[in-house]
């Protein structure tokens, strides 16, 4: 059975880009007779906005979204992540890293998603472990392409050794890394289809590699076009995208429907009816492949 999900981070309130992702993932799930889960990706408490998680859920309800089951909170799933890391340790796929970011980035080159880790701690005994310092844990990556066929973008691949380097699964400060948590959660929740923004396209080969290492199924991916401002920057909390105005719910839903190339919806003042209409007219093949700049 199709199982999709929407996974916001409570570092801020939902904005127009969040609404586009929620609407597209919801329409794709419901049009395929599937489930739509909501998962709160609250892995990084220092970056979270107080009250944002409850506000996000209230906003989704106000826009007519109905999710299946209980909301999952990553902050309550640390035992799952610990068990997942233990499996990788047992398989000999991970190693402790005592490098500070400043330490290794000084001699590193840029790759597909920031600096490529240079492997300073990859081989046991290569560097003495500092006393009293907790390490990060990294996974060894292969020198080969990891590719997949995206439902919107098409073919996409990375050579993880060249483009990314061995990446962190557990940070030295004790916080779990996004890549491990999202793979563990998707597998445990039975997620089969992931519809999300193209800013996460670059993360997907890492997640597929982790899925291969853990022997869990790889979902089908579809990465949505980003909404960008006049400067070409993604609409986000960092670029000061305004929070969704609950007094303009119908107008905002119609706006994201246009960005997704849905036909014009009939007049109604009920957001849930607009979502039902989007489900009935959903066509992934018509979703734009490239960024959209709202007028």
Curated annotation (Swiss-Prot):
Taxon lineage: Bacteria, Pseudomonadati, Pseudomonadota, Betaproteobacteria, Neisseriales
Name of this chain's protein: Glutamyl-Q tRNA(Asp) synthetase
Annotated organism of origin: Neisseria meningitidis serogroup C (strain 053442)
Cofactors demanded by this protein: Zn(2+)
Pfam family, one: tRNA-synt_1c
Residue positions binding L-glutamate: 5-9, 41, 178, 196
UniProt keyword terms in alphabetical order: Aminoacyl-tRNA synthetase, ATP-binding, Ligase, Metal-binding, Nucleotide-binding, Zinc
InterPro entries cross-referenced by the UniProt entry: Glu-Q_tRNA(Asp)_Synthase (IPR022380), Glu/Gln-tRNA-synth (IPR000924), Glu/Gln-tRNA-synth_Ib_cat-dom (IPR020058), GluQ/Sye (IPR049940), Rossmann-like_a/b/a_fold (IPR014729)
Short motif 'HIGH' region, span: 8-18
Sites where the protein binds Zn(2+): 97, 99, 117, 121
Family: Belongs to the class-I aminoacyl-tRNA synthetase family. GluQ subfamily.
Any one GO biological process: tRNA modification
Ligand binding (ATP): 237
GO CC list: cytosol
Gene field: gluQ
Function: Catalyzes the tRNA-independent activation of glutamate in presence of ATP and the subsequent transfer of glutamate onto a tRNA(Asp). Glutamate is transferred on the 2-amino-5-(4,5-dihydroxy-2-cyclopenten-1-yl) moiety of the queuosine in the wobble position of the QUC anticodon.
'KMSKS' region, short sequence motif: residues: 234-238
PANTHER family, per the entry: GLUTAMATE--TRNA LIGASE, GLUTAMYL-Q TRNA(ASP) SYNTHETASE
Cofactor detail note: Binds 1 zinc ion per subunit.
EC nos: 6.1.1.-
One annotated GO molecular function: zinc ion binding
HAMAP family for the chain: Glu_Q_tRNA_synth
Domain of life the protein comes from: Bacteria
